[in-house]
UniProtKB/Swiss-Prot annotation:
EC number(s) stated in the UniProt entry for this protein: 2.4.1.-
Active-site residues, as the UniProt record annotates them: 266, 419
Tissue-wise expression: Mainly expressed in flowers and seeds, and, at very low levels, in seedlings, roots, leaves and stems.
Phenotype upon loss of function: Normal xyloglucan (XyG) levels. Plants missing several xyloglucan synthases (e.g. CSLC4, CSLC5, CSLC6, CSLC8 and CSLC12) have no detectable XyG levels and several associated phenotypes including reduced stems height and leaves area, as well as shorter root hairs and reduced pollen tube formation ability.
Assembly: Homodimer.
Protein name: Probable xyloglucan glycosyltransferase 8
InterPro entries recorded: Glyco_trans_2-like, Nucleotide-diphossugar_trans
UniProt record similarity statement: Belongs to the glycosyltransferase 2 family. Plant cellulose synthase-like C subfamily.
Residues annotated as transmembrane: 106-126, 180-200, 497-517, 522-542, 640-660, 665-685
Molecular-function annotations in GO: glycosyltransferase activity; protein homodimerization activity
Length: 690
């Protein structure tokens, strides 16, 4: 049979293609018609219904498959997290817990507070299940007549309500209002600093050199136009980083006859002393003017080391001194970017460069530190340098005019923050400071929580020591009154004392108390909106860290315990305020340094030829080399931090109490803050210490 030709089939095929069809009519009264889509009337309805039903079934199956996969992934992540926690805790040594020493007063107070909170929570739970829901109403109705008293336990509970409302709530309200005022004042100060930084960026304000100094074509000459520069590298048992810091300093682009490097080694380990001495000898043989100094009597920590080095007779021939800690790696043009700022500025005493971190992305702890330090350098140091010509010397990556050091009294051993001490005394003597935000020096941040905690304790106890010692000198100095007010009110009180005081008191003491005393409940904007806004301001200098805003906020509240304890120790001269512990380094290098080192070793090995050596001696040498290459296995340990753990249980207890009172925001804040304290207390953040 011949195939049947149907115009309807042809029309259906053309309409399925979706090709636009334009029909033109000769009569101008007709308009142009454009057909875009096929007519739905030609589509078979029964088949589409069957097809849609199958599609729905397949969609449901796909969604179920995705849900199962998601649950499997969550379970895998959860079990892997538990496994890593178990492995970390398995390394906890019986003696690896935190030593409280004379600072155990804070831990004892937290324990007492925790026991009282657990007792009150148990009492509240009994009352809750008995149906005494008085605490759900902020305006509590306390039974007064004997007819309303149901039992002896009910009588005790009513007595607790009366005691709470009449005697406990009023002082807590007063303290919370005081802390909220301090919180708002500090927030305004932080906001003003950010506005000042934006103004500097908008106006492109920065210290500039008037002309090009020390041209490269004059470098091969006598170098008489180059000032004499002394470079000091203080170190103490810095096995991991001594080599890269000495190497970087010895490659500074400066005439050799105008530069002297002092390696100030305070190590008490003879093997480390020998390593550093060999490194100095190696660079000395290459023509670098470098000296190794080791003190037999190690007093005064870093300040004593620097003071001893400045007492050498040959220092009188030098005009400037650059200081680098053992983990700092300056670029070769560092001196050419900093020293020219001193020319024709006799009042300038210090040029400070910015820190850059080679290990900022190593773990969560280093990322959170990077947020804080970026704000410190980008905002605080830059704004104070531009508008006040004064800021706290960071202790390293800076160049001092030696005359300014001498007129200010030199390095003193009275505190553990000798850098801030010399900066304040130089400011009182009228010297000005310059901060260079675009000159960066590579360094490390602590990768373990233990090292970071010790560093922060020293950084926050020292300023309080210094404040006690310098207050009279500030009041009797000849500087302007507004400079005295800035030093006392802003530099010391607001940013060094008030900040750790209110952050710990408000979020770690008052907030959990108010869960058991609902008459003094904190408003939501205090615990949620304002802290998030301030965290956003802190993250602005490091925009890539924006995903870590919530961990940053929680971790900063966790660190308030250490900072508050350090502040009190320094203010009242407790034992730990005089403790100096060298921050543990990992010895990280930049990627370019690692690549250069790899190339150097690969070129060195094939060209090594040993002559005049027998086969047996070659075998012994190879065995010794293999032993040197084998890494020394050092067991890493976890530490238990008692104060953080006690506060974790306290906040979680308060979270349970807030759950009974149906306080949503307070519950979630206390829950996540308590879990953060728990993770930190178990040393589950950062690397483990070896």
């Amino acid at each position: 049979m011949a195939p049947r030709f149907d115009f309807s089939d042809l029309w259906a095929k053309e309409t399925r293609r979706g090709t636009p069809v334009v029909v033109k009519m000769e009569n101008p009264n007709y308009s142009i018609v454009e057909v875009e889509e096929p007519d739905s009337a030609f589509q078979p309805m029964e088949k589409s219904r069957g097809k849609n039903a199958k599609q729905v079934t397949w969609v449901l199956l796909l969604k179920a498959h995705k849900a199962v996969g998601c649950l499997t992934w969550v379970a895998t992540v959860f079990w892997s997290l538990l496994g890593s926690v178990k492995r970390r805790l398995s390394f906890t040594h019986p003696l690896g817990s935190e030593r409280l020493g004379r600072d155990g007063w804070l831990f004892s107070a937290i324990k007492l507070f925790l026991v009282a909170s657990l007792a009150i929570l148990a009492f509240e739970l009994v009352a809750y299940y008995r149906g005494w829901h008085y605490f759900k109403n902020p305006n509590l109705h306390i039974p007064t007549s004997k007819l309303e008293i149901q039992s002896l336990l009910h009588l005790f509970y009513v007595g607790w309500l009366s005691l709470r409302a009449d005697y406990i709530a009023p002082p807590i309200k007063a303290l919370s209002k005081f802390c909220i005022v301090l919180f708002l004042v500090q927030s305004v100060d932080r906001l003003i600093l950010c506005l000042g930084c934006l103004w500097i960026k908008f106006k492109k304000i920065k210290p500039r050199i008037d002309e090009e100094h020390f041209r490269n074509d004059d470098f091969e000459g006598s170098g008489s136009e180059y000032p004499m520069v002394l470079v000091q590298i203080p170190m103490c048992n810095e096995r991991e980083v001594y080599e890269q810091s000495i190497s970087a300093v010895c490659q500074l682009d400066w005439p050799k006859d105008r530069l002297l490097v002092q390696v100030l080694d305070d190590s008490d380990d003879e093997s480390i002393q020998e390593l550093i001495r060999d490194e100095v000898t190696k660079w000395s043989q290459k023509g670098v003017n470098i000296i190794y100094r080791h003190r037999l009597v190690r007093t005064g920590y870093k300040a004593g080391n620097l003071k001893s080095a400045m007492s050498c007779d040959y220092v009188e021939a030098y005009e400037f001194v650059a200081i680098f800690d053992a983990d700092f790696q300056p670029n070769s043009d560092f001196l050419k970017l900093t020293v020219p700022h001193f020319k024709e500025k006799p009042e300038l005493g210090l040029v400070q460069a910015r820190w850059a971190f080679v290990n900022k992305d190593e773990n969560l702890l280093t990322r959170l530190q990077n947020i804080n330090l970026c704000f410190h350098f980008e905002v605080e140091q830059q704004v104070n340098g531009v508008f006040l010509n004064f800021f706290g010397f960071n202790g390293t990556a800076g160049v001092w005019r030696i005359k300014a050091l001498e007129e200010s009294g030199g390095w003193l051993e009275r505190t553990t923050v000798e850098d801030m001490d010399i900066a304040v005394r130089a400011h009182l003597h009228g010297w000005k400071f310059i901060y260079l935000n675009d000159v960066k020096v590579l360094c490390e941040v602590p990768e373990s929580y233990e090292a970071y905690k010790k560093q922060q304790h020293r950084w926050h106890s020292g300023p309080m020591q210094l404040f006690r010692l310098c207050l009279r000198s500030i009041l009797t100095s000849k500087i302007a009154m507004w400079k005295k007010a800035n030093l006392i009110l802003l530099f010391f009180l607001l940013r060094k004392l008030i900040l750790p005081f209110y952050s710990f008191t408000l979020f770690c003491v008052i907030l959990p108390i108010t869960m058991f005393v609902p008459e003094a409940e904190l408003p939501i904007w205090v615990i949620c909106y304002v802290p998030i806004f301030m965290s956003l301001l802190n993250i602005l200098p490091a925009p890539k860290s924006f995903p870590f805003i919530v961990p940053y906020l929680l971790f900063e509240n966790t660190m308030s315990v250490t900072k508050f304890n350090a502040m009190v120790s320094g203010l009242f001269q407790l034992g730990s305020s005089y403790e100096w512990i060298v921050t543990k380094k990992a010895g990280r290098s930049s990627e370019s340094d690692l690549l250069a080192l790899t190339d150097k070793e690969s070129e060195k090995m094939p060209n090594q030829i040993l002559r005049g050596v027998s086969d047996s001696e070659l075998l012994e040498i190879s065995q010794v080399e293999e032993q040197k290459k084998q890494p020394v296995s050092v067991k890493k340990t976890n530490k238990i931090f008692h104060k953080e753990l006690a506060l974790a249980f306290l906040l979680l207890t308060a979270a349970v109490r807030s759950l009974l009172a149906s306080q949503g925001v307070h519950f979630y804040f206390l829950l996540f803050q308590g879990l953060t304290f728990l993770l930190v207390g178990l040393d589950l953040i950062g690397e483990q210490m070896s």
